[in-house]
UniProtKB/Swiss-Prot annotation:
Residues 26-64, 69-107, 122-163, 166-204 form the LDL-receptor class A domain. Serine protease that plays a key role in innate immunity by activating the Toll pathway in response to infection with Gram-positive bacteria and fungi. During Gram-positive infection, acts downstream of PGRP-SA and upstream of Grass and Spz, and therefore appears to function in a pathway that links detection of Gram-positive lysine-type peptidoglycans to Toll activation. Functions in a separate pathway to the psh-mediated activation of the Toll pathway. This is Modular serine protease. The record marks 368-369 as: Cleavage.
Length: 628
């Protein structure tokens, strides 16, 4: 990755070469000398890619002086490198410090809110929590150039927290993004945590500058040295007795609190202010995976030092990289950005979700002799069976339903409602089965998957038979999401404008799924056509306002076991949609329920989902926000 545009400015190019030749004279005039003595081409310096073996060509000390020369259309990394203009938030780390892909630069509103909550921890509003646990005021101590957390990690001056910031024109931007007074640059003292305000190329000097010294407390000057802050291990002596310090003599065992891992020996002997081991043990903060990788819309692949590691571990060391791909049944228009565990034990960005790919089906169908179509599960992959256990030996079939998200089912309220108590049945008496080909609970196929129910939500106005099944609609949240496949997919929903909500129009060609009443009760779908509420009233004068009806076509029937199932229709998608094919959409839920082994020969009453937009969308949004 070379930025040959600098060649278009010969005066800049000659001046830059002269500076490099003056300060790094060991290499020839067309080369840059790395800190380890290696020589690389001048054109490979400050281009976002580490070309020196030690990476010294991509540091703030080397690159911060080039900032004024990096203008649009190029993108300027926080430490000063100049890279391709599309680098910002394209999912690829073009900058050596990752400043083009930080969470605060690229994250959505949810990512930023989550980041702010974690940064605040249990501190007050407008404060942030250091790794050591102390709370500091954001406006005074965050990204001010100083290591105010004083733990040696520069946490409050990190690129992740400060790299996205814009500094005022009168100030100087440090190599990690913090802002200091412009008068402090090149004053002979390091006022930026990374020393970038005294960079040799910026200040035209080669002498070492002084760094303010943090005076250690007298306690730490006595006895064997120990790390400060959260890096300090838990010290125990004989009999697991916790030691405080100073440690002047004796054998000490080291351990760390949860979330930290010990680097160094587990025990050492202290004498004459020195440990018997060559390195001082310290605790390193690892990145927690709690809530980071979880989500049914993506799958994660974790690596550390180039080796694949188990993502399910509760903590990962700094340097761990996580790649994501969309789960089956989900998609994205651009590659998902990677996550990295940073020094200090935090992730550089949040996980990005994929979009649900609903309403898709596959495989041909064959005609069923009675007028319905016996089908492969892929033809109605959103259709599920609802089974109940009421003081019996096993579950028995109750109703059908439709999958809205991997963990949310829509069905009829009367399927889960106790007319005697006027309350829903207990959620733990139900079980949902997806990809169910045979209706009987005990007749299974390898494709079917089972989930328990953890929450039942019934439409607030539902009163059962007393109100003639008005608002006959319920949502079931599952204890665990289904893993989507070619036989398990959610149905699409869309909601019309206010004026169009009152009724489904006439003659919408669609179908509903159920299990036939013959032989093994195999899965089938029934073709049908819709009729508006006003047309339905000619046959059913007491039909409620939230209903429409469908007429089954041919000899096909709607039977008792079809209650709760969905009437769906294939529709073309919007030309501006990210979908490029027709999709199947849910129009209504079967409400009327003939007696067992009876079927409706004429019309079937449906609950129109358009009357429940808030209820449905709120539940779907909860699923996406908490579990996708």
């Amino acid at each position: 990755m070379q930025l040959i545009s600098f060649l278009s400015n010969p005066l800049f190019f000659c001046a830059l070469l002269l500076k490099f030749r003056t300060i790094f004279a060991a290499c020839d005039s067309s080369q840059f000398e790395c800190d380890n003595g290696s020589c690389i081409s001048q054109y490979d310096v400050c281009n976002g890619e580490k070309n020196c073996p030690d990476g010294s060509d991509e540091t703030a000390l080397t690159c911060v002086s080039q900032r004024q020369h990096c203008t649009k259309p190029y993108f300027q990394c926080t430490y000063g490198a100049c890279v391709i203009g599309t680098a910002g938030c394209n999912g690829v780390n073009e900058c050596a410090d990752g400043s083009d892909e930080t969470r605060l630069r690229c994250g959505n509103e949810d990512d930023i809110r989550q980041h702010d909550r974690r940064l605040q921890g249990n501190c007050k509003e407008n404060e942030f929590k250091c790794p050591s646990g102390i709370c500091l005021d954001k406006s005074n101590f965050l990204c001010d150039g100083k290591d105010d957390c004083a733990d040696g990690t520069g946490f409050d001056e990190s690129v992740e927290l400060c790299g996205h910031m814009e500094c005022p024109a009168y100030s100087f931007k440090c190599g990690t993004g913090g802002c200091i007074s412009g008068s402090l640059s090149c004053n002979g003292e390091n006022d930026c945590y990374d020393g970038s305000d005294e960079a040799p190329l910026l200040c035209n000097t080669t002498k070492k500058v002084t760094t303010p010294v943090v005076t250690e407390t007298p306690l730490e000057l006595l006895g064997c040295p120990l790390p400060l802050g959260d890096e300090r291990p838990i010290l125990t002596g004989d009999g697991s007795r916790v030691l405080t310090g100073p440690i002047t003599r004796g054998t000490v065992r080291f351990s760390c609190k949860q979330g930290y891992v010990l680097e160094g020996e587990e025990s050492s002997y202290c004498a004459k202010n020195k440990w018997s081991t060559s390195t001082i043990p310290k605790c390193v903060k690892y990145c927690s995976t709690a809530g980071e990788f979880d989500g049914y819309s993506t799958k994660a692949l974790c690596t550390h030092n180039g080796q694949q590691v188990e993502c399910r571990k509760p903590f990962h060391p700094p340097g761990t990289e996580v790649k994501f791909v969309c789960s089956t049944g989900f998609k994205t228009l651009s590659p998902l950005p990677e996550m990295r565990c940073m020094k200090g034990g935090y992730w550089n960005r949040g996980r990005q979700r994929c979009e649900q790919d609903c309403g898709q089906l596959a495989t041909p169908i064959k005609q069923f002799s009675s007028g319905g179509y016996t089908i492969n599960n892929t033809v109605v992959p959103w259709h599920v069976g609802l089974y109940v256990w009421h003081n019996e030996k096993d579950y028995h079939f109750q109703c059908g339903g439709s999958l809205l998200t991997p963990d949310l089912v829509i069905t009829a309220a009367h399927c889960v409602y106790d007319e005697g108590t006027r309350l829903p049945y207990s959620y733990d008496t139900f079980r949902v089965i997806a990809a169910k080909f045979y209706r009987n609970y005990g007749e299974t196929t390898p494709e079917e998957k089972r989930r328990d129910v953890r929450l039942i939500e019934i439409a607030p106005g539902y009163k059962g038979r007393t109100e003639n099944y008005y608002q006959d609609l319920a949502l079931l949240t599952l204890d665990e999401p289904f893993e989507l496949s070619h036989v398990i997919r959610p149905i699409c929903v869309t909601f019309a404008s206010f004026a169009e909500k009152e009724s489904v129009t006439d003659d919408v060609q669609g179908k509903f799924a159920g299990w036939n009443i013959e032989n093994k009760h195999e899965l089938q779908f029934v073709p049908a056509v819709s009729k508006s509420n006003s047309v339905c009233r000619r046959n059913l004068r007491d039909i409620q306002a939230d209903k429409f009806c469908i007429f089954t076509q041919g000899k096909s029937l709607a039977c008792q076991g079809d209650s709760g199932g969905g009437f769906t229709s294939e529709l073309p998608t919007n030309a501006f949609s990210t979908w490029n094919t027709a999709r199947h959409f849910l129009f209504g839920v079967i409400s009327n329920a003939p007696n067992a082994d009876q079927c409706a020969h004429s019309l079937t009453v449906m609950t129109n989902i358009q009357h429940f937009e808030d209820m449905i969308l709120n539940a779907m949004n909860r699923s996406v926000e908490t579990r996708s």
